[in-house]
Regions:
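Cytochrome P450
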Residues: 1-241
Length: 241
C-alpha cells in the first residue's frame, strides 16, 4: 500500500488490537486511530500525490464513478486487516497440524504431495476468517429456514468447510485432499481480494519448510486468540529441525 516503513509495526499492531483486544474500549480506540491514519493519508496525498496506491484509487474516486473519501478509508482499513491477520494464522495452523501428523508432513517433505495442494487443506482446516454476515434484501429460504427481508444471516465457514455432503472424511486432516471446495475465502461478490496473494504466501512457506526442515515438533502448548472473527494462534512453541 506504499505506507512509510516507519509506520508498519504501529499499523500492524493497531490492526491486531482492533480485531482481537479483549478490551472493547481498546478495540474501538484502535479502529478510530486506523481510520484517522488513513483519512490523513488520503488528505495528505491530495496535496502531494506521493503515494501511488492511494493516488490510483483517489484518481478513480475523482472520476465520478468511484469511491468517496469515506469508502476509500474503509477499503484501506479492510485491505490492511484482511492481509495482516489471516495468512499468518493459516501458516501457524498448518505448522501445528504438521507437528501433530508427522505422516502428513512426510508426504509433503518427500514430494508425494505438492505444497500448493497442501495449501488448500491448510486453508480448509484453519479458517482464519470464521464467519461472514449478510442482510437479506428479499425473502429467501436457506435450507429449512425462512429468512425475512432485513434479517441477518451468518455463515460459519468452519462448519461449511466440514460439510459431510461436500467433503469425504471432513474431520480428517489430509494434505493430499483433491477437489477441496473449501470456502475459507468466502464466495460471491465479496470473495477475498487477497486470495491469490495468500495462496502464494502459504505455498512459498511450505516450499521453504520442505527445503530447510526435516521435522516439526511442538515443545509447548499452542495458545489461541479470543476472537470469534479473525481466529488463530498467537503462540506456537515449536522446534523445526
Ligand atoms: C488465509 C488468508 C485469508 C483468508 C482466510 C481470508 C478470508 C476472507 C474472507 C472469508 C473474506 C470474505 C468476507 C465477506 O464475504 O464478507 C475476505 C475478504 C477480503 N479479504 Fe481476505 N482472506 C485472507 C487473506 C487476505 C489478504 C492477504 C488480503 C489483502 C492483501 C485480503 C484482503 C481482503 C479484502 C480487501 C476483502 C474484502 C473484499 C470485498 O469485500 O469485496 N485477504 N477474506
Amino acid at each position: 500500500m506504499g505506507l512509510p516503513r516507519a509506520d508498519w509495526a504501529w499499523i500492524g499492531e493497531k490492526t491486531t488490537e482492533a480485531f482481537e483486544s479483549p478490551s472493547e474500549v481498546r478495540r474501538i480506540t484502535a479502529n478510530s486511530e486506523i481510520f484517522k491514519y488513513f483519512y490523513d493519508l488520503v488528505r495528505e496525498n491530495r496535496r502531494t500525490g506521493a503515494n501511488e496506491f492511494v493516488s490510483g484509487l483517489t484518481a478513480r474516486a475523482g472520476s465520478g464513478s468511484g469511491l468517496t473519501d469515506e469508502e476509500l478509508v474503509f477499503n484501506f482499513a479492510g485491505i490492511l486487516a484482511g492481509g495482516n491477520e489471516t495468512t499468518r494464522y493459516t501458516l501457524a495452523a498448518l505448522t501445528l497440524e504438521l507437528a501433530r501428523h508427522p505422516d502428513q508432513w512426510r508426504r509433503i517433505a518427500e514430494g508425494e504431495v505438492d505444497p500448493s495442494v497442501a495449501t488448500e487443506e491448510g486453508l480448509r482446516w484453519s479458517v482464519p476468517g470464521m464467519h461472514v454476515m449478510r442482510t437479506a434484501t428479499e425473502a429467501v429460504r436457506v435450507g429449512d429456514a425462512e429468512v425475512a427481508p432485513g434479517e441477518r444471516v451468518v455463515t460459519w465457514i468452519g462448519s461449511a468447510n466440514r460439510d459431510p455432503e461436500v467433503f469425504d472424511a471432513p474431520d480428517v486432516f489430509d494434505v493430499g485432499r483433491t477437489g477441496n471446495r473449501h470456502v475459507s475465502f468466502g464466495a460471491g461478490r465479496h470473495v477475498c481480494l487477497g486470495s491469490r496473494l495468500a495462496r502464494l504466501e502459504i505455498t512459498a512457506y511450505l516450499r521453504a519448510l520442505r527445503g530447510m526442515v526435516t521435522s516439526v515438533e511442538l515443545n509447548g502448548p499452542p495458545r489461541y486468540n479470543g476472537s470469534n472473527f479473525t481466529w488463530g494462534l498467537n503462540e506456537l512453541p515449536a522446534v523445526l529441525s
